[in-house]
Every structure is written in C-alpha cells, then in structure tokens.
C-alpha cells in the first residue's frame, strides 16, 4: 500500500511536469461505472482479413466491437483477390477488395455516429496487387472511403524497379487448383512472379517461402510512382509505408509479419496488436525561454520519461480491449509507444530555428534520451515484475531466422537450437543494435534478463492532446501550422 501511495504521487508529479497519456486513457480510465465497455487503448490492428466471405464478414464484426470500445483500427485489404477474379464456390466473379472496403467504411460511420468520438480506420494495400491503381485513386470519387486513412505498402522491389525504370508486375497469389485448372506455368516469368505474402497456407509456395503470384498486368514502375505522387499531392493520400523496412527494424522480427498500422500510421502492428500511447510535452522543460540563457532541463526530462514509462506499463493491465485475441497479444508483449509533442514550440522557446542543424541535433538528443530512459525503466520493471512473457519464452532457430540475421550463425546458432526470446529481442533486433551503440551495457543486461515490454517509443501526431492538454503547443515533431484555428466538436 505504501508503494502504491508513493507511485501515485510520482504519477501525479509526472502528469504535472509534461506527461500526457493518450486520449483513450484520459477519457476512459476510471470511468468503468459510466461506460464499462470502453478501452484505454487508442488503436489496434485487425486480424488478417483472409480471402473468404466468412473471414471478411467476421472481421467486420470484430472491427465493430473494437470501434464501439473507442479504439481505432487498421487493416490490410490486399489479401483479397482482385476485381474480376473468379470465385468458384459462388460461380461468379468478385467485385474486388475496394467494394468490401466500402462495407467497413459504412460500418465505421454507423458505429461512430452512435457515440461521442469519430471512428478511425487505416486501410493498407500492397503496391503489387492488381487493384493497386484503383486503391490509389479511390478517394478521387466524392464521398468514398471517408472513414479511412489509406496507405500503400511499398516494397524494396518496387523502389528498385522505380530507380531502374523497369516494368512492375501487378499480381495475386494462386492456389494449386488454379495452377492445374488454368494451366499456369510456374517457371514462366511472364505468367508468374514469386513474392513474399502475408497469407501462405492456401497458396503455392517454393522452398524459399515465396508465394507464386499470377501476373494480371505489367506497367512501368515510374508511371505507377507518378500516379502515387500526384494523388498524394492532390489528396494527401495514400500514405507511404516502407513495409520491408518496417519489418526489418521490428523488435519482434522473428515472430511477427507486420502488414498494417494504426489509423495515424505511427505504430506498425501485427495482427490484433494494440497501440498504447502517451506523449511528453517538451515545452515543460524549457528554462528561461526567449532569453540568451534559455536551456532544456535534461535531468527532469529523463525522470519524467522513466516515471511515465511505468505508468504506461500499468495501463496494459486495464486495457479494456473487447476481443480475446487483442487482450492476449498486449499482455504477451506489453508494447507501448511513448513519444513527444511540442518540438516546434520548444525550439522557438530555445531560440533555435526549426530545420537548422542545431534543431536536428536537439531532436536527435531528445529522441535518444527518451529511448534510453525508457529501456532503463524497462529493465528495472522486468527485475521487479518480470519481463514481457514473450521474452521469457524459448523459440526454435529456423532457416528463416538465420537468413534474416546472419549474425546468429556467426555466433554459433544452428537450425533447431532453442533460443530465448530476450536474446532474439535485445541482441539481434536492428533497432536494439542502435541502442547498443549508445548503451552497450544496458542492452547486454536486457539480453540476460529481458525487458518489461518489447517496444517503447512511438511519436504520434498528437493533434488533440497538443490543443487540449498542452496549451496549443505544436503537435508531434512538426512546426506550428497555425497559432489559432477552429475545430469542430461532435457534441457538448
């Protein structure tokens, strides 16, 4: 009880000194008597929407429950076969993934109109899907997909094709039945390309784990690039997710294949992953602003981050997520995303021009200290309460692991060996390798003992909390867009 009182005082101190939990925590934590079916989690990612009517409608149902709880949700829709493809069970041709996105769009509008918060959705789509061009242009149609943010999953292969001005194949996976019935030659490069795909069970797969994809159309990669750029310029969509880079830098690289993000895009997540957020208001740490003696209080900043890290970890226990799979996912990995807001305003208070070399160094310092302080607390919490369950588990070394991380083989790991999750996380994550460049002893301790969580940092746009709780400081890492503006409120 005495420790509870101590940390209560510490949490209040951190909140007064710039720690701002995300909107769902502020809105729903402690409000169980008035709205028991709500969550403290801002956003989630759906389970994989597989290519069947049952799966599509099942995920609509899950999304409805998630939105009802106050969470936003992201999905990948390029798992669905393209428009005009034959559906053998129905004896008809499919209308394609965009038409099914319309169902999710209407569902989101209907559910959110019943509550006090507008629903938020992210739809992601692979750049190699046959309907990718339709996806890119979808918001040119008035009123369509207005409950969605849209992002393209951009692969390294596509970027290389753009650089080399090569043709780009728009293709979709084939089953063995389709290969046999349609006489597809798997060795014909004009008919088939082999690609990584998020769903593998039902499709033809080679020894390298790549999926056979039937080419529907080939277009110049630079033409597609121009369409993406013009749409982004005209409508600010679709977003641009370098998905291979995301998976390469994912701390849980050995057990997750990320294909979607939360609605604002700051946190790529696996199936049923949750986005537990909080931000630190940097303007609170500027001493004697607008003077020659203006400086940043680094010691207090580090301590606020440490206390806030413990607070966000506690929120995992009261997540209030509606689906069993969501609750299991967050409890197993305990990921959260702490970021900062007010960077632009803080630079102004310090007399630093936004975009100058000095501002870049300050931003690097802020992000580095946020990460280091967070992982230090992650180690301390693991010692006190235990590491995230996944980091206490053991995993079998696979050929895929050794292919992704050649350093494992150099260190003596072989296929079939048993390796603790904490070592895969701390020693072989590319992100944790960057942390180790600054704090090698800390990362080595994390490899030996494990961390309380698998992920710590995530910088959100913070549009609402910057205005309502940070005295209209600039949001996220951006400069101030305007010093006064109007904002609509759904209801009073």
Where do the language-model regions lie?
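Extended catalytic cores of very large enzyme megasubunits
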Residues: 1-492
């Amino acid at each position: 009880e005495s420790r509870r009182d101590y940390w209560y005082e510490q949490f209040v101190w951190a909140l007064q000194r710039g720690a701002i939990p995300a909107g769902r925590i502020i809105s729903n934590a402690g409000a169980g008597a008035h709205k028991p079916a709500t969550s403290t989690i801002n956003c989630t990612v759906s389970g994989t929407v597989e290519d069947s009517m049952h799966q599509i409608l099942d995920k609509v149902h899950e999304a409805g429950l998630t939105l009802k709880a106050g969470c936003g949700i992201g999905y990948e829709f390029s798992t669905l076969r393209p428009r005009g493809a034959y559906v053998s069970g129905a004896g008809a041709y499919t209308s394609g993934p965009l038409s099914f996105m319309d169902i999710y769009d209407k569902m989101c509008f209907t559910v959110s109109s019943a509550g006090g918060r507008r629903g938020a959705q992210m739809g992601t789509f692979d750049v190699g899907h046959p309907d990718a061009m339709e996806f890119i242009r979808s918001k040119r149609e008035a009123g369509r997909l207005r409950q969605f943010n849209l992002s393209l999953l951009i692969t390294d292969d596509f970027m290389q094709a753009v650089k080399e001005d090569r043709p780009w194949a728009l293709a979709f996976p084939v089953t063995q039945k389709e290969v046999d019935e349609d006489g597809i030659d798997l060795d014909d490069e004009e008919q088939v390309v082999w690609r990584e795909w998020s769903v593998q069970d039902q499709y033809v797969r080679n020894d390298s784990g790549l999926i056979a994809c039937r080419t529907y159309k080939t277009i110049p990669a630079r033409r597609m690039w121009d369409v993406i750029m013009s749409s982004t310029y005209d409508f600010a969509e679709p977003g641009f997710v370098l998905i291979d880079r995301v998976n390469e830098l994912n701390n849980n690289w050995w057990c997750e294949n990320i294909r979607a993000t939360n609605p604002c895009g700051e946190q790529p997540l696996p199936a049923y992953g949750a986005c537990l957020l909080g931000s630190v208001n940097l303007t609170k740490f500027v001493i004697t602003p607008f003077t020659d003696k203006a400086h940043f209080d680094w010691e207090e900043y580090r301590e606020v981050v440490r206390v806030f890290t413990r607070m966000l970890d506690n929120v995992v226990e009261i997540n209030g997520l509606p689906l069993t799979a969501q609750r299991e996912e967050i409890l197993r990995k305990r990921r959260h995303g702490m970021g900062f807001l007010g960077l632009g305003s803080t630079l102004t208070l310090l007399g630093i021009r936004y975009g100058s070399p000095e501002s870049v160094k300050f931003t690097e310092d802020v992000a580095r200290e946020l990460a280091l302080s967070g992982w230090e607390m992650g180690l301390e919490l693991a010692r006190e309460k235990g590491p995230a369950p996944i980091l206490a588990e053991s995993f079998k070394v696979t050929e895929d692991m050794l292919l992704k991380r050649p350093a494992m083989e150099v260190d003596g790991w072989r296929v079939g060996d048993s390796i603790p999750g904490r070592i895969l996380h701390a020693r072989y994550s590319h992100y944790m390798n960057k942390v180790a460049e600054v704090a090698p002893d800390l990362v080595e301790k994390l490899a030996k003992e494990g961390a309380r969580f698998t992920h710590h940092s995530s910088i959100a746009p913070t549009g609402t909390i910057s205005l309502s709780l940070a005295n209209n400081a600039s949001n996220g890492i951006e400069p101030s867009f305007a010093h006064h503006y109007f904002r609509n409120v759904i209801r009073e």
